[in-house]
């Protein structure tokens, strides 16, 4: 499998894909995540940060992931690096099927991701229901309005999306991405699709300095170059057909990719630089 994560002595992938076209990723699920202290009888105990790695190594489809979570593995509250990360997951496959996996105090839940979007807390059902608060959103501009007996002619575009939340909270990002995913013009091929998805993800990315942490906690040796802000370190797009993992970073908007099909015969793990230094293309001498 190919993915992004911190290796240390064991591989814990934040997200990735495998040779069968199964894709998975995890996101922060603060306050709501809860894991059992021990495994169910007859199941494998699994620390939450290793779920993506385990599923990509053993499953070929979303259906197999769901079945494994129900029958083969238990997510248990065993600390990793001194803590149990509060996380939840999303898995998709080549059929277009997608699920959200959330472990709460009342048990493990697997939801079919019909909206096609996932952010952070609260849980997926809450975010989906919250869309009912935005029935007015549409891509079509509103026409003339009557006020005080006068007709006011529109003088700008975008009025159909008036009320679309623009802050960086997870509920607002969910609504924003759900609207964009529903109405954005789909790409005609993989290159166009990848470019479109990065444009959509950019609308939900955290600019450095816009979201200051209220309680960053104790700084540990693992916090290299830590800053007191929440920001989008990287954005990624995965393609199940080409088995490509595309990404760009906060400081470098040049899109890079790794193609898993060209690495399948390898016999050792590989790491690739994120490419965080800015790159600019000088075309001064190319004018005609």
What positions do the PLM features span?
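N-terminal domain-start signal
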Residues: 1-2, 27
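Short, small-residue-biased leader/transition segments that mark boundaries at the very start
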Residues: 3-8
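Structured, non-membrane catalytic/scaffold regions adjacent to prosthetic-group chemistry
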Residues: 9-117, 122
């Amino acid at each position: 499998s190919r993915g992004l994560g911190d290796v240390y002595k064991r591989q814990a992938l934040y997200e990735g894909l495998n040779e069968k076209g199964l894709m998975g990723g995890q996101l922060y699920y603060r306050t709501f995540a809860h894991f059992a202290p021990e495994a169910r009888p007859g199941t494998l105990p699994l620390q939450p940060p290793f779920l993506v790695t385990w599923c990509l190594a053993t499953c070929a489809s979303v259906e197999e992931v769901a079945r494994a979570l129900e029958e083969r593995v238990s997510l248990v509250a065993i600390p990793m690096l001194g803590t149990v990360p509060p996380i939840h997951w999303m898995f998709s496959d080549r059929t277009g099927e997608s699920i959200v996996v959330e472990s709460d105090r009342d048990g493990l839940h697997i939801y079919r991701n019909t909206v096609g979007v996932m952010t952070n807390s609260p849980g997926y059902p809450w975010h989906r229901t919250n869309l009912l608060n935005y029935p007015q959103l549409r891509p079509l501009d509103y026409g003339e309005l009557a006020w005080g007996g006068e007709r006011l002619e529109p003088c700008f575009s975008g009025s159909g999306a008036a009320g679309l939340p623009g802050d960086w909270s997870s509920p607002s990002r969910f609504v924003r991405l759900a609207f964009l995913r529903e109405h954005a013009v789909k790409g005609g091929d993989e290159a166009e699709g990848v470019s479109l998805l990065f444009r959509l993800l950019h609308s939900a990315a955290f600019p450095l300095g816009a979201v200051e942490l209220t309680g960053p906690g104790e700084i540990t040796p693992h916090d290299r170059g830590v800053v007191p802000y929440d920001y989008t370190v990287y954005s990624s797009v995965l393609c199940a057909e080409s088995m490509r993992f595309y990404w760009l970073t906060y400081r470098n908007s040049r899109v890079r990719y790794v193609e898993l099909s060209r690495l399948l015969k390898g016999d050792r793990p590989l790491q690739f630089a994120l490419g965080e230094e800015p790159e600019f293309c000088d075309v001064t001498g190319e004018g005609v």
